[in-house]
Amino acid sequence: MNTQQLAKLRTIVPEMRRVRHIHFVGIGGAGMGGIAEVLANEGYQISGSDLAPNPVTQQLSALGATIYFHHRPENVLDASVVVVSTAISADNPELVAAREARIPVIRRAEMLAELMRFRHGIAVAGTHGKTTTTAMVSSIYAEAGLDPTFVNGGLVKAAGTHARLGSSRYLIAEADESDASFLHLQPMVAIVTNIEADHMETYQGDFENLKQTFINFLHNLPFYGRAVMCVDDPVVRELLPRVGRHITTYGFSDDADVRIESYRQVGPQGHFTLSRQDKPLMTVTLNAPGRHNALNAAAAVAVATEEGIDDADILRALAGFQGTGRRFDFLGEFPLEPVNGKSGSAMLVDDYGHHPTEVDATLKAARAGWPDKRLVMVFQPHRYTRTRDLYDDFANVLSQVDVLLMLDVYSAGETAIPGADSRSLCRTIRSRGKLDPILVSDADTVPETLAQLLQADDLVLVQGAGNVGKVARKLAELKLQPQKKEEEHHGR
């Protein structure tokens, strides 16, 4: 952003008083890094710490941020404020030093709320679909020339970044319910895609508590704001009478205000019509597969229609939508001859979905778009508690693939729970007689194991939220070819 654009922005969004240097503890996370990127572009001095470099820290370094790959007290001593992610423990030396120095320590969502405070905020909440819906809304507003600021939990591929500072009053942000921190936000428009039992440790294991928290979030809207809610989701539908704000519903349901009709999928694209109250029928080509993405698009269209964005801009944005990182992310199609000597090729897709509902949506999209392909999944369960709580659901959905390679559970810092591990899950799936899962304890051996199994026209889905994305990128880099053993490499 140039000086003239920043000056224009300052007429809308004033600077934070007495804040010059902002330090982020855990800056490499997508949500943290996105906020840091926006603030860096606004002209604030940014520093942060994390355990290892990644694309987020590299991007921030390129913007002039100071990044430390260690946590030390001296990192924070010049800071005006310290921003922390929920992954950071209370005894972190930087947090301890900040408190001793009486430097304000705030959560990520509080800083996001500050960014939103003087803007027209659009917050996207829900158990599934937040990242893609946020990207779709951002793409439509950008196509319409509204130059929004956006802060997303995943890479917006068209922009090549998780976040971007725009010069207008619009801020589009993913709202995180995992730690209930979305209650800090006070948007003008709020989308709720769906509500399922996830992150229940935050809500004391009480689903009613989770539902009430979503109600409280929606009541952060001003009385003239608008809630955009997916009426297909039974929990969202149940909550409608309790929401004391203007509501637009969307979905496949007959009573939806924005209704999806005549959906069909051809390869990676969805084709459908949208009926809207007092508006012409909209014929949509969506460059994203699956009925779940049609729902995400309907939410984005509902918001854009309410804002008065021209239908032509909406349709262009959806037809040209480039997707988000690790959401049915097509990494290539590779010939099998150098992999295992077979003819034909195999497709490689990377997907972040780690809840049974998300995995099921990915599988349905794959089956609908490529009905003749064999589905080969490399799956990494995420968290022992989630595996335990949704054990039967995981067993059911994973039994739908044709070939299953399962990595060990990505613990995310949790202690192992007996019976909620990958070996147990493989055993349960095997006992159902539909397929024989392969437990892969060493992720480095995935290319070699896959090479023995792959056939022409396979679709390989690398699925999960832990570090399995690195496996997907490695497979793409290797073009699915197994790595040569050291002795072969040296000609022994």
From Swiss-Prot:
Gene Ontology biological process terms, A to Z: cell division; cell wall organization; peptidoglycan biosynthetic process; regulation of cell shape
Which pathway is this protein assigned to? Cell wall biogenesis; peptidoglycan biosynthesis
Keyword line = ATP-binding, Cell cycle, Cell division, Cell shape, Cell wall biogenesis/degradation, Cytoplasm, Ligase, Nucleotide-binding, Peptidoglycan synthesis
An example Gene Ontology cellular component term from the record?
cytoplasm
Where primarily located?
cytoplasm
- Record's catalysed reaction(s): UDP-N-acetyl-alpha-D-muramate + L-alanine + ATP = UDP-N-acetyl-alpha-D-muramoyl-L-alanine + ADP + phosphate + H(+)
The cellular location(s) given in this protein's UniProt record come to: Cytoplasm
**Disulfide-bond pairs as recorded:** none
Q: Name one GO molecular function term.
A: UDP-N-acetylmuramate-L-alanine ligase activity
Q: What does this protein do?
A: Cell wall formation.
- By its UniProt entry, which HAMAP family does this protein fall under? MurC
Q: What is the protein name stated in its UniProt record? A: UDP-N-acetylmuramate--L-alanine ligase
The coding gene here is murC
